[in-house]
């Protein structure tokens, strides 16, 4: 069937073109939409071995294209709003600037598809394959991408406000400067994803996997990260104000110059993390794991570190004045020139800790274990300097 026959049959009132062979058809610019009478092209084949089907600017609003073969088709600026593309093959198709708002793309193959500047507002895309697709600057506000495959996809500066990414795969995807405000990312896979400068305000990342992700300057204000894995990620200059990080894994993360105002950190794993210069003053860090963490020049004054694990941590020149370190483990830690004035170290483990030049003036050391500790030049609780 060529374009002329299709249009003649359409003009005659025919709307059902299921199983039609439309290989190599050129329909641009056409209008296949009349009021509520949308065409049915179920299982239609619009492919040709050597030529791409051209549907540039075509109006297929509300069309039924279930399982249609549209791979490599040029649908740039086409209107597919409300269309049914369930199970359709759109692999490597061009949909730049297309209108797919409210379209049903459940299980569709959009791998390598060009969707930059496309409108996918409210689109239904669960279990869709968007691997390697370009969605840069696309609008996906409140779209459903649950369990979708977006590995290696480009979503740079995309509007992903309120999008459902639950259990989806975004590994190696680029979401640089994307707007993910209130996005649902529970259980999603973001291994080595680039979210630098992205906005994740109030986003839900509970139990999400962000291993080795680029999260520089990312905004996590009021985000839910409870149980999330951010191990080995770069969070430098990120904003985590009022975020929920309960039981999150931030081991070996880079956290320099981050803000943590009013955030929840109970049960968090910060072992091996780089927190140099970070302000954790007066934070509730009871039982926290900071083993082998880099905390040089960090501010932990007045922090609650009861039963915290700081074994092997590097705390040179850190401020822990007035900190609560009852039963804390500081064994084998580097505490060079640390300020522990008026800190409570009752029953703390300081075995083999290096307290050279430390300030312990007014500190409480009741039942603290200092076996093997180095105290040369340290100011002791009574104000005297240890010389031996």
Report residues per predicted region.
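Tandem repeat scaffolds
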Residues: 2-388
């Amino acid at each position: 069937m060529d374009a002329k026959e299709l249009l003649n049959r359409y003009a005659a009132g025919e709307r059902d073109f299921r199983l039609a062979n439309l290989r190599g058809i050129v329909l641009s610019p056409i209008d296949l939409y009349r009021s509520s009478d949308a065409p049915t092209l179920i299982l239609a084949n619009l492919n040709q071995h050597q030529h791409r089907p051209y549907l540039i600017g075509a109006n297929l609003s509300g069309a039924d294209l279930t399982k249609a073969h549209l791979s490599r088709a040029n649908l740039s600026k086409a209107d597919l709003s409300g269309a049914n593309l369930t199970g359709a093959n759109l692999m490597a198709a061009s949909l730049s600037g297309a209108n797919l708002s409210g379209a049903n793309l459940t299980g569709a193959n959009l791998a390598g598809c060009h969707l930059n500047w496309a409108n996918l507002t409210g689109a239904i895309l669960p279990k869709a394959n968007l691997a390697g697709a370009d969605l840069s600057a696309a609008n996906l506000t409140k779209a459903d991408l649950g369990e979708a495959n977006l590995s290696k996809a480009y979503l740079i500066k995309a509007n992903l406000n309120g999008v459902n990414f639950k259990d989806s795969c975004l590994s190696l995807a680029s979401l640089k400067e994307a707007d993910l405000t209130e996005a649902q990312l529970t259980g999603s896979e973001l291994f080595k994803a680039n979210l630098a400068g992205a906005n994740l305000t109030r986003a839900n990342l509970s139990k999400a996997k962000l291993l080795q992700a680029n999260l520089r300057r990312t905004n996590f204000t009021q985000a839910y990260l409870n149980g999330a894995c951010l191990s080995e990620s770069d969070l430098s200059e990120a904003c985590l104000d009022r975020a929920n990080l309960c039981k999150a894994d931030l081991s070996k993360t880079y956290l320099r110059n981050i803000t943590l105002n009013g955030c929840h950190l109970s049960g968090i794993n910060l072992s091996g993390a780089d927190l140099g210069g970070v302000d954790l003053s007066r934070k509730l860090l009871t039982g926290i794991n900071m083993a082998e963490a880099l905390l040089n020049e960090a501010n932990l004054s007045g922090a609650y570190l009861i039963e915290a694990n700081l074994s092997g941590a590097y705390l040179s020149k850190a401020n822990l004045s007035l900190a609560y370190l009852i039963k804390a483990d500081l064994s084998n830690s580097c505490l060079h020139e640390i300020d522990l004035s008026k800190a409570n170290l009752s029953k703390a483990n300081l075995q083999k800790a290096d307290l050279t030049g430390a300030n312990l003036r007014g500190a409480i050391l009741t039942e603290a274990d200092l076996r093997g500790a180095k105290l040369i030049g340290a100011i002791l609780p009574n104000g005297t300097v240890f010389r031996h």
